[in-house]
């Protein structure tokens, strides 16, 4: 008999992601090109320009000085594929951006921004859905690891990550059915409030 898997507590609500409580971390999926040009990414860029500058710089550094990580041969329930590959960073990773003073002053709340790098490109160059799901598995695992490190290191920080809030990432312009990404989140063992727009 298989041991029970750790399931996270996913709560889905209708509303505005940006109304998350002070100190919350807002999770969304990103491309690796440094562009938040459409969809919810554009809303993030408009609301958190200082965080966008950090994201863009992170992408530009890795575009100009490529680095890779080796993804071992693994098969998940979700990806259905077995193959090893070299993944060009930041693809398959997470970037956790602490609240930026300029953004917090403009918005009245301190929000952490978590970028999950799930697609290499965007628009016509968006990665295929199965690649996005595999990258989501890697990025959520990386996010979970980084959050654990931040939690153990919080004694030396003024601010710690509060609640985790998320949009239905990958389901918009990346075109991956939400259920596939939700399954990855459920397997991560985290408590996340997922916000969908009113009527969405």
From Swiss-Prot:
Domain Macro: 1-200
Reaction catalyzed: ADP-alpha-D-ribose 1''-phosphate + H2O = ADP-D-ribose + phosphate
Gene3D superfamilies listed in its UniProt record: Leucine Aminopeptidase, subunit E, domain 1 (3.40.220.10)
One Gene Ontology term from the biological process aspect of the record: DNA damage response
GO cellular component terms attached to this protein's record: nucleoplasm
PROSITE patterns cross-referenced by the UniProt entry: MACRO (PS51154)
Keywords: Hydrolase, Protein phosphatase
MF annotations from Gene Ontology: ADP-ribosyl-[dinitrogen reductase] hydrolase activity; phosphoprotein phosphatase activity
Alphabetical list of CDD domains matching this protein: Macro_Poa1p-like
Entry annotated with the keyword Hydrolase: yes
SMART domains found in the cross-reference section: A1pp
Domain of life: Eukaryota
EC number annotated for this UniProt entry: 3.1.3.84
Function according to Swiss-Prot or TrEMBL: Highly specific phosphatase involved in the metabolism of ADP-ribose 1''-phosphate (Appr1p) which is produced as a consequence of tRNA splicing.
Name of protein: ADP-ribose 1''-phosphate phosphatase
Organism, scientific name: Aspergillus fumigatus (strain ATCC MYA-4609 / CBS 101355 / FGSC A1100 / Af293)
């Amino acid at each position: 008999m298989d041991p029970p898997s750790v399931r996270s507590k996913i709560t889905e609500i209708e509303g505005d992601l940006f109304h998350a409580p002070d100190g919350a971390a807002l999770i969304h999926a990103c491309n690796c090109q440094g562009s938040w040009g459409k969809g919810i990414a554009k809303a993030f860029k408009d609301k958190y320009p200082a965080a966008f500058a950090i994201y863009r710089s992170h992408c530009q550094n890795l575009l100009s000085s490529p680095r890779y990580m080796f993804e071992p041969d693994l098969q998940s329930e979700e990806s259905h594929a077995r193959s090893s590959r070299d993944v060009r960073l930041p693809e398959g990773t997470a970037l956790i951006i602490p609240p930026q003073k300029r953004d917090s002053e403009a918005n009245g709340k301190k929000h952490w921004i978590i970028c999950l790098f799930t697609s290499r490109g965007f628009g016509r160059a968006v990665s295929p859905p199965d690649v996005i799901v595999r990258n989501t598995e890697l990025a959520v695992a990386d996010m979970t690891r980084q959050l654990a490190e931040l939690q153990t290191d919080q004694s030396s920080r003024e601010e710690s990550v509060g609640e985790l809030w998320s949009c239905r990432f990958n389901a918009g312009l990346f075109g991956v059915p939400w259920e596939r990404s939700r399954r990855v989140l459920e397997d991560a063992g985290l408590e996340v409030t997922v916000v969908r727009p009113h009527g969405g």
